[in-house]
């Protein structure tokens, strides 16, 4: 069942950073908005595709959510609130302006929750950050998303956050191109559409 869901998924990962990919779970935000996180199961599926959950972990969370439907609904709303706050924060960054305090407050609330769950665990000859009591935590994916946002906001890469130049897209992405001149979240879709429109307009003007 999980394999079928992934094959028919509408999620795309063109942001080059986890938290930016999460903000891009709304299609055509400024024209004909299409919400991609319509249920807690959708949130779990996105988390699985983003490699935050294994297939077994995703399956367990779905079963857990069936037993805790009200809590799952609250987590979904928290996820959407966090996503919208992150979108506005990084949109402001991309445009060279300052985000609103209430948007940062939303992020800080989730980040504080995440850090309260953080722990350092040994892995082979090294150590890594993990989360305590995560197995049945319906909001466990939010911890990693909030940490991802905090990492990006405090990194040198913050200056490379961009907003897609396509008017019908406006997704966010991290520009990792060599000369930092990337304009589109995905050249194959938004870039090609923009070039086609430009060519059509020029051809019409010279006709």
Residues of each region from the PLM?
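Short helix-coil boundary/hinge micro-motifs
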Residues: 1-160
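Cys/His-clustered metal-coordination modules, chiefly Zn-binding fingers
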Residues: 128-207
């Amino acid at each position: 069942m999980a394999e079928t869901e992934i094959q028919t998924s509408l999620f795309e990962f063109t942001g080059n950073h986890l938290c930016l990919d999460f903000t891009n779970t709304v299609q055509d935000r400024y024209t004909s908005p299409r919400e991609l996180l319509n249920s807690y199961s959708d949130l779990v599926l996105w988390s699985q595709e983003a490699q935050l959950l294994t297939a077994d972990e995703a399956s367990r969370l779905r079963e857990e959510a069936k037993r805790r439907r009200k809590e799952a609904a609250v987590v979904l709303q928290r996820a959407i609130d966090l996503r919208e706050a992150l979108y506005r924060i990084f949109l402001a960054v991309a445009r060279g302006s300052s985000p609103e305090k209430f948007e940062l407050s939303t992020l800080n609330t989730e980040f504080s929750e995440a850090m309260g769950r953080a722990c350092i665990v040994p892995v082979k000859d090294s150590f890594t950050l993990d989360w305590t009591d995560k197995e049945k935590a319906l909001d466990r994916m939010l911890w990693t998303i909030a940490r991802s946002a905090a990492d990006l906001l405090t990194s040198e890469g913050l200056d490379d956050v961009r907003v897609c130049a396509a008017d019908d897209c406006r997704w966010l992405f991290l520009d990792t191109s060599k000369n930092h001149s990337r304009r589109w979240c995905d050249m194959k879709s938004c870039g090609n559409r923009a070039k086609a429109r430009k060519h059509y307009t020029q051809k019409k003007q010279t006709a």
